[in-house]
């Protein structure tokens, strides 16, 4: 039985990502918890005497125990592909991270642009039937990121762990025909950086594992304004120091700007897709000519992979060459853009007007899974 008073409780927010899931409560300034989107299953079944031991581990605990586990991500390039594991991940977020009963509070879950219909309906089914949430809503990650910048019309450049996309939005609605996606993002840049470091001839006093290279990427990588000129600079101008876990200090050079270059030149990774600047231009030119100037004038960066120093300047420089003459271009790079989507969700679910947006358990019972197609857009 649906309890209408449940809508008076702060909503639970799950921002689902290939790298991390961010969880928290409506009205707060940021997510309470950020958990790696990983589920680990025991490689070997426990003897019967230990039958009560945990059969799977989630997030950082799974990564810590990875030698004894088979690790799986429920996401593939932003889309949910492992439903049993994503359910385990959500159960962990409800019970162990937030400590709330799913049946007590409404839930807003984020979704990638162009999320397939079957995924949207399956998510509603899992939340209502398996978790018993009183109300549910699905919202586009890019739209929420734009809300976090106090805009309802603009173009969002969203780049996270597994997908980079450009999403034009008009008056709060994404324009799906003009969305452009690139399967080059954070994890690909980390892998490329590792290859470049190993090929650079450096000898490293400790093993270069993914976690270490990821840390180097986040702390030292940058986007060059003019990549060819950057390669011709003297070594002492580009070298940066990094302190390894064992205390040794290493100096790193060109790989620090060569790895993020893959966002602008995906051909480095064998992709024939257009780079970031061409994606933005392509998305905007697919929109009605009446709003193209508005979109060029309200470009918002979102996601952890847009945090590279220099990315916004490079994007602006290339867009000025691609756009028609005298087109005003503005790029907003919010400092908290790793959490922009979550913050946008927190804002909208705090509005009293959002109450009428929720898909309630009664709605689900009456109309079935297809209700999300009519109500969540």
Swiss-Prot record:
GO terms for cellular component: actin cytoskeleton; cytoplasm. It holds the Pfam family Actin. Its main location: cytoplasm. It is found in: Cytoplasm, Cytoskeleton. It comes from the Eukaryota. SUPFAM superfamilies: Actin-like ATPase domain (SSF53067). Keywords: Cytoplasm, Cytoskeleton. The keyword Lipid metabolism does not apply. Gene3D superfamilies: 3.30.420.40, Actin, Chain A, domain 4. Belongs to the actin family. This is Actin-related protein T2.
């Amino acid at each position: 039985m649906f309890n209408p008073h449940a809508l008076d409780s702060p909503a639970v927010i799950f921002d689902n990502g290939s790298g991390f899931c961010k969880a928290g409560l409506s009205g707060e300034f940021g997510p309470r918890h950020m958990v790696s989107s990983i589920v680990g299953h025991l490689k070997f079944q426990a003897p019967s005497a230990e039958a009560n031991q945990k059969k799977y581990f989630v997030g950082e605990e799974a990564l810590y125990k990875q030698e004894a586990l088979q690790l799986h991500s429920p996401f593939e390039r932003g889309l949910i592909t492992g439903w049993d594991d994503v359910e385990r991940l959500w159960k962990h977020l409800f019970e162990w991270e937030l400590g709330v009963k799913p049946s007590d509070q409404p839930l807003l879950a984020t979704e990638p642009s162009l999320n397939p219909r079957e995924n949207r309906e399956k998510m509603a089914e899992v939340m209502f039937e398996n978790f018993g949430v009183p109300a549910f809503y699905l919202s586009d990650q890019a739209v929420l990121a734009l809300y976090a910048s106090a805009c309802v019309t603009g173009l969002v450049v969203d780049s996270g762990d597994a997908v980079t996309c450009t999403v034009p939005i008009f008056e709060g609605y994404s324009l799906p025909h003009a969305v452009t996606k690139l399967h080059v993002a954070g994890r690909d840049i980390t892998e490329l950086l590792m290859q470049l470091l190993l090929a650079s001839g450096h000898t490293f006093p400790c093993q270069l594992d993914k976690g270490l290279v990821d840390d180097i990427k986040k702390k030292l990588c940058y986007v060059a304004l003019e990549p060819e000129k950057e390669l011709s600079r003297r070594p002492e101008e580009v070298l940066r120091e990094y302190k390894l876990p064992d205390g040794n200090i290493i100096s790193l050079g060109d790989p620090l700007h060569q790895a993020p270059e893959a966002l602008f030149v995906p051909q480095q990774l064998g992709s024939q897709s257009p780079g970031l600047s061409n994606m933005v231009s392509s998305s905007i030119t697919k929109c009605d000519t009446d709003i193209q100037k508005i979109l060029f004038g309200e470009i918002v960066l979102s996601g952890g992979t847009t945090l590279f120093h220099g990315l916004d300047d490079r994007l602006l420089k290339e867009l000025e060459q691609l756009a028609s003459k005298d087109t005003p271009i503005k790029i907003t790079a919010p400092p908290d853009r790793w959490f922009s989507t979550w913050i946008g969700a927190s804002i909208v679910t705090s509005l009293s007007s959002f109450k009428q947006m929720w898909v309630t358990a009664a709605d689900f019972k009456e109309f079935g899974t297809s209700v999300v197609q009519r109500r969540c857009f």
